[in-house]
Regions:
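Cell-envelope/extracellular polymer assembly enzymes that use nucleotide-activated donors
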Residues: 11-14, 42
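The conserved acidic donor/metal-binding loop of glycosyltransferases
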Residues: 123-127
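N-terminal membrane-anchoring/stem segments of glycan-assembly enzymes
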Residues: 1-9
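A conserved acidic beta->alpha catalytic loop
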Residues: 47-67
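Short aromatic/hydrophobic "clamp" motif used to bind/position activated sugar donors
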Residues: 119
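Short, acidic, metal-binding catalytic loop of nucleotide-sugar glycosyltransferases
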Residues: 31-40, 60-68
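Conserved donor NDP-sugar-binding/catalytic core segment of glycosyltransferases
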Residues: 131-166
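Glycine-rich, basic loop-to-helix element that forms the pyrophosphate-binding segment
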Residues: 29, 74-113, 135
Length: 166
């Protein structure tokens, strides 16, 4: 995967992380994505109308600043976006704050603001292995005419000690 990580032919990826009342896990999930070994990606966190401190924690941890964004309405069922934020310290991090509408609506909002041809969706309690995106994108590079989607393997770490991670 090392050659793939340095290749100019690797597709850029938009990682979409939807979060509704995820104050306990969202920071760790964001850190996990940001530590990926991948040449070019953006992370779009969609705060789906959380009533806890999810958005406030993100704003504090990643120095979010309100940003005007142009929203393509390529997917109509994306709900009402209240605001978008960019990190002052992490250029590939964008946060969308929207009214609660459920996971599919949150992901649609993320797709509408994404910049890249491939996207990956994850939950706010997920952690990635360092090469997860490289492994996921590889089939697209090997057979772009036939591959339209890939999936990952989910492993439960409840009660386990994570040595490398957020």
């Amino acid at each position: 995967f090392e050659a793939l990580a340095k290749s100019h032919f690797t597709f850029p990826v938009s990682v979409l992380l939807s979060a509704h009342n995820e104050e306990k896990s969202v920071i760790g999930a964001v850190r996990s994505v940001l530590s990926l070994d991948y040449p070019e990606f953006e992370l779009i966190v969609i705060n789906d109308g959380s009533t806890d401190s999810t958005l406030a924690l993100l704003a504090s941890e990643f120095q979010l600043e309100r940003k005007d964004s142009i929203v393509r309405r390529s997917i109509q069922d994306a709900g009402v976006i209240r605001a978008t934020y960019a990190s002052a310290t992490i250029p590939n991090l964008l946060v969308i704050d929207k009214e609660h509408g459920g996971k599919s609506e949150a992901l649609n909002a993320g797709i509408n603001l994404s910049r890249y041809p491939l996207f990956c969706t994850i939950d706010a309690d997920a952690m990635f292995q360092d090469n997860a995106l490289l492994r996921a994108v590889r089939p697209f590079l090997e057979d772009p005419d036939r591959v339209i989607a890939v999936g990952g393997q989910v492993r439960v770490v409840n009660g386990c000690r994570v040595v490398r991670g957020p």
